[in-house]
Design a protein with these regions (language model features):
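Short beta-strand segments
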Residues: 33-68, 84, 95
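Short, basic/aromatic recognition patches
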Residues: 9-37
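Structural motif
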Residues: 60, 81, 114, 163-165
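Short, structured beta-strand-loop surface elements
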Residues: 68-127
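Anion-coordinating catalytic cores for phosphoryl-, nucleotidyl-, and glycosidic chemistry
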Residues: 18-19, 27-28, 61, 73-74, ...
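C-terminal edge-of-domain segments
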Residues: 1-15, 116-198
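Short, surface-exposed beta-strand-loop junctions and turns on beta-sheet-rich folds
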Residues: 55, 69-71, 172-174
Length: 198
């Protein structure tokens, strides 16, 4: 039986309220997540998504690109409205006797907000200090710290979130996984060819 489509939820509302991450969980996840994806929209109406290394400081996403003309900077100039997404896949597991009774543990954060270009050199320096502390912590390869001679050839962006949602699927205990426990989403299904096969 086909389900009748329902009206889409308002932006920022999650249908699965049982999977909502707390604000503290979202903050911790964004602080350590490795890579995010930024979605912009161009003057031609096409969306454009790029992966970015980033930092999360004082409830703001910071990222950078090289100082050159491309889709990303053109889209930012066209519209400051963006979406930013981070996810972390976990372990695939079975929870029932039907093949499609398969799921995965995960964490995912999506935000909608406004992006700006940072022109202040002190702000850009703080970004690069936090960026290098995250991706190349003190002691990495024994190099000089705090020198950013190519800062002038980069563009630093700040995304101020307006709406942030976090969603997670927690890996169940082994005792709650198939075949120890059958939590199938299709309780009436029987193996094909069995006498009760519909």
């Amino acid at each position: 039986m086909t389900k009748t489509p329902t009206a889409p939820p308002l932006r920022g509302q999650l249908r699965r309220t049982d999977k909502i991450m707390t604000a503290a969980e979202v903050d911790e996840f964004l602080a350590r997540a490795f890579c995010g994806r930024t979605a912009t929209v161009g003057a031609d109406g096409y969306p454009y998504v790029v992966p970015n290394l980033f930092t999360w400081l004082r409830s703001t996403i910071y990222l950078h690109t090289v100082l050159s003309e491309g889709h990303f900077i053109a889209n930012v100039r066209h519209s400051d409205r963006v979406s930013f997404q981070v996810d972390e896949p976990g372990e695939i597991f079975a929870y029932g006797h039907v093949e499609c009774d398969t799921s995965v543990s995960y964490r995912s954060v999506i935000m909608f907000g406004r992006i700006t270009i940072l022109d202040d050199e002190a702000q850009k320096t703080r970004f690069f200090e936090s960026f290098m502390a995250k991706y190349a912590p003190a002691g990495s390869w024994g190099r000089e710290r705090g020198s950013f001679p190519r800062m002038g050839s980069t563009i630093v962006y700040a995304i101020a979130p307006e709406i942030v949602t976090g969603k997670q699927g927690i890996l169940p205990a082994v005792s709650d996984q198939w075949p120890i426990r059958n939590l199938t989403g299709s309780p009436g299904w029987k193996p094909k060819g069995s006498p009760s096969d519909p």
